[in-house]
Amino acid sequence: MYAVFQSGGKQHRVSEGQTVRLEKLDIATGEAVEFDQVLMVANGEEIKIGVPFVDGGKIKAEVVAHGRGEKVKIVKFRRRKHYRKQAGHRQWFTDVKITGISA
């Protein structure tokens, strides 16, 4: 059984017991979270597709950890003009473990 849901402007395909990295959620580590924007649920040959969301579809998960990703370097450069700027960015994320899928 697997499902596709929406969180943080992105879509994720998950199955029960899987750990997924999402955009940062303001929920403490160890707490439960429920996603109701379920786009599709598949159970063997039976597939439910939402318009845009599946009626009664819910994904239950537990927050495992919060953190920051790898640093992305941003460079602005103009040749022959002695101009160079550097910046960096590290995106916050939340790891969640899927505990249940229902539709």
Curated annotation (Swiss-Prot):
Cellular component aspect of the GO annotation: cytoplasm; ribonucleoprotein complex; ribosome
Molecular functions (GO terms): rRNA binding; structural constituent of ribosome
Q: What GO terms describe the biological role, i.e. biological process, of this protein?
A: translation
Q: Which UniProt keywords apply?
A: Ribonucleoprotein, Ribosomal protein, RNA-binding, rRNA-binding
Per the record, the similarity remark reads:
Belongs to the bacterial ribosomal protein bL21 family.
Entry-linked NCBIfam families: L21
Quaternary state and interactors: Part of the 50S ribosomal subunit. Contacts protein L20.
Q: What does this protein do?
A: This protein binds to 23S rRNA in the presence of protein L20.
Q: What is this protein called?
A: Large ribosomal subunit protein bL21
Give the source species. Pectobacterium carotovorum subsp. carotovorum (strain PC1)
